[in-house]
Amino acid sequence: MSTLQVDIVSAEEQLYAGQASMVIAPAAEGDVGIAPRHAPLLTRLRPGELRITPEGDEEEFFFYASGGLLEVQPHKVTVLADTAVRARDIDEAAALEAKRRAEEKLREQKDEVDYSSVQAELAEAMAQLRTLESLRKRAKR
């Protein structure tokens, strides 16, 4: 079976380095699935879930990335994330609170509110919560 070398790196640390049979990433224009021998690609990441399927029957790994770059070569995938965490390390209470605060700011509609940054905050919180939900669904199987 053919595999890819996958590296997930943030400014703080390297979160993952290993072989995988599939990577699913939140590219700017939509999710992309990357298998071995994929065509070269360089794209921005939007906030969302990264899913790594290791070779063999091992369980998938889930990560959250706040954005960054995805570089794909035929046998290598590199994620350079602005911020990234393992899904199991996401603070659900903090994500829910960030979501609540962003929604409140959007409802207030004050002149000094920077709507694009508030929408970005809301998108990040929602992406973290979706990543946690995916992890929980996989755990139930």
UniProtKB/Swiss-Prot annotation:
Complexes and interactors: F-type ATPases have 2 components, CF(1) - the catalytic core - and CF(0) - the membrane proton channel. CF(1) has five subunits: alpha(3), beta(3), gamma(1), delta(1), epsilon(1). CF(0) has three main subunits: a, b and c.
Keywords in alphabetical order: ATP synthesis, Cell inner membrane, Cell membrane, CF(1), Hydrogen ion transport, Ion transport, Membrane, Transport
A Pfam family of this chain: ATP-synt_DE
Function statement: Produces ATP from ADP in the presence of a proton gradient across the membrane.
Protein name, entry field: ATP synthase epsilon chain
Keyword Nucleotidyltransferase included in the entry's annotation: no
Membrane topology type: Peripheral membrane protein
Gene Ontology CC terms: plasma membrane; proton-transporting ATP synthase complex
NCBIfam families reported in the protein's UniProt record: ATP_synt_epsi (TIGR01216), PRK00571.1-4 (NF001847), PRK13442.1 (NF009977)
Family the UniProt entry places it in: Belongs to the ATPase epsilon chain family.
Gene3D superfamilies: ATP synthase delta/epsilon subunit, C-terminal domain, F0F1 ATP synthase delta/epsilon subunit, N-terminal
Organism: Halorhodospira halophila (strain DSM 244 / SL1) (Ectothiorhodospira halophila (strain DSM 244 / SL1))
GO molecular function list: ATP binding; proton-transporting ATP synthase activity, rotational mechanism
